[in-house]
Amino acid sequence: MAFRNSKIVLILLQIVAFWSVWRWYFLRLSTSNDETYGILAIVAIIALCFKKRAETSAVSNVNFIIVTTLIYAVSFPFLPPLLRTVVAVTSLTFAISGWFFGKKFHFGIWSLFLLSLPIVASLQFYLGFPMRILIGEATAILLKLNGLVVFREGVCLHFGEQSVWIDAPCSGVKMLWTGMFLASILVTIYNFSLRKIILSFVCAFGIILTGNIFRATGLFYLEAELIKMPSFGHEAIGVSAFILTCVGIVAVILKIRNFDKSESTNQLNSGFQISNFQIKIFVINCIIAFIVPVFAVGNQSAKVNQAIGNFPTIFEGKQLQELGLSEREQFFLNDFPGEIKRFTDGNREIIIRFVTTATRKLHSASDCFSAIGYSIKPLPLKIDESNKNWACFTAKKGEESLNVCERIYTENSESWTDVSAWYWSALSNENKDYWAVTVAETAE
């Protein structure tokens, strides 16, 4: 039967069956500039597949494909979109591993699929603050070894009367993605065994962490004005750390490649064979996986309990005038467990969000601006006349250029400059009134 030997049909059927997750995937790509990194991982998978196709005998993983496709269909109504997509790409990994790489499961391809998912914003939200704490502590130790009296408080390094903010790029989330992307490509090209893949990823993570520690250390000297550099000094330090990190990852993986070259990579050469019964079961599972999302969509709009806040009428001594919600606020209003209001004080636009519990729905202002097409550039930490800390950035779109600052606070003077730090604190402090204030004004 022609279908039996047509492996590409199997993969195409899977792709069609998983239509719902692709719809979610491309929606996320269209609403965040950061998530477009995932396209690089997809391109890498396609290129690696066609490179290996001519070198490797295909094997059939159809039983694993059938099981994972069924798991996708059964779990679809209960899993959030990201986890559904993980199940879908796991099933695709089984198919691609068997056809293109002659293996039951290629963890290098799977890691590239995972990196292709829209996870950068989520990684920044959940891991950004812990990684900044870790990097800040290590940076403080290095600076002390160099004779400087420095201590870390939150995500700031204090030196005398100066406070140097460990900014979001220093958390290394984007460098973590890039480093793991590079490592995934290399372990796939060299067809590493599982043991070598794990070793490569562990070493890559350590190198990425080290690179970010040295980046934060260099930026401390610059921000604390202990050294003088041109205006592009900040970018130069970041680019240098990035290049050295990538070189380190390549060097280590090449070294790992030479370990025990006789080690088996578990490549199989049993041929690609599928029985008529397996074909029928596979097609039935694909049909079920295709249909389930149609019936599940209507059950996913659970009602969100929205907290109601007593919004201020005066901000920094100026009377506030309420405005209608703009495109930025409307985009993130769905399922937001609180209130959002937009004001002006005559010169600036002020967005105030109110929640009473830790939630992933409280996005950073930079994510909101990025989602509707603004390019974002971080600015140094701002300390206002009331000694309050603000995280700031510039947002540009066409001819429009804005300076935007944000902070989150409670009535008892607790405050945070980014949502990741706030989230981890709010997890253990439920049922408080949290106010997220974003101030945007035209850049001079």
What are the language-model segments listed below?
Residues 1-444:
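Hydrophobic N-terminal alpha-helices or hydrophobic patches in metabolic proteins across all domains
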